[in-house]
Amino acid sequence: MTDDLNGSARDCVSKPMNAGEVHLSINAGVASVVFDRPLSRNAMTWLMYEQLGSICRRLRVDHSVRVVIFQGAGGEAFVAGTDIEQFKAFNSGDDGVAYERTIDQGIGLIESLPMPTLAVISGWTIGGGLAIATACDFRIATPASRFGVPIARTLGNCLSMSNLARLSAAFGVQRVKRMLMLAELLGADEALACGYLQQVCEPAELNGAAATLCGRLALLAPVTQQVTKEALQRLLMRGLPDAEDLISQCYGSSDFHEGVDAFVAKRSPVWTGR
């Protein structure tokens, strides 16, 4: 029997047009979380981030759930970042600090779920979408999937320290430099080779592979899984230096506002270094 919990997620905030939704359903101990905004490659709106947080808080206390799957709707993207239109309202570096702090809290809710988590990826996994996937314990993807944070080409913003720590642990520092400083996108083969992906399989086999991995995880000791997750998270996040001054500098720059304006206008940005 499937428990469809979409209504509770929708009710947490009012829904503007094309704001997208995050759906939750639970079947036989497996929770499925779906990012549903396929016409925009599942780019996250503020509403979707709020719904995701509400869902994670609900799952955290649901002891019937053994595994959580995160997946994008439509087959073209997992999540293609945060909807850039929303950044037009940013006026200062403080807005960027508040945004990164909020995103960190949301990603932390995924990371701190007590049960194993799996990102099932088909297509673009960019920016905030890469952060969501990286917060999961395991990831499987299709061969055409792409991974990156091309903000040096698009927005001219930066990442939080905790987001950088997660990406560096998952990919290695040099690959993170390629993604951030060269705006490169990594393919599925490279993501598999460096250990970021558990498996690469054809689109028709993706859901079956996810079900198989969920079955393996559900048979194993949940306390061991939970304690291991928490211990690794403590190791990763211990003693991270503060970087809010860097975030404020970046989001408060003229280049950031130029990046947003250029993206919305569908033109190439003109960077000035200011």
Show which residues each predicted segment covers.
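Conserved CoA-thioester-binding segment of acyl-CoA-metabolizing enzymes
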Residues: 2-71, 108
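Well-ordered beta-strand positions
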Residues: 138, 178, 182-184, 190, ...
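Glycine- (often His-adjacent) and acidic-residue-rich active-site loop
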Residues: 64, 72-109, 155, 239
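Glycine-rich beta-to-alpha transition loops that act as phosphate-gripper elements at the mouths
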Residues: 120-126, 180-183
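CoA-thioester-processing core
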Residues: 106, 110, 126-179, 209, ...
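C-terminal long alpha-helix characteristic of the crotonase
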Residues: 140-145, 197-242, 271-274
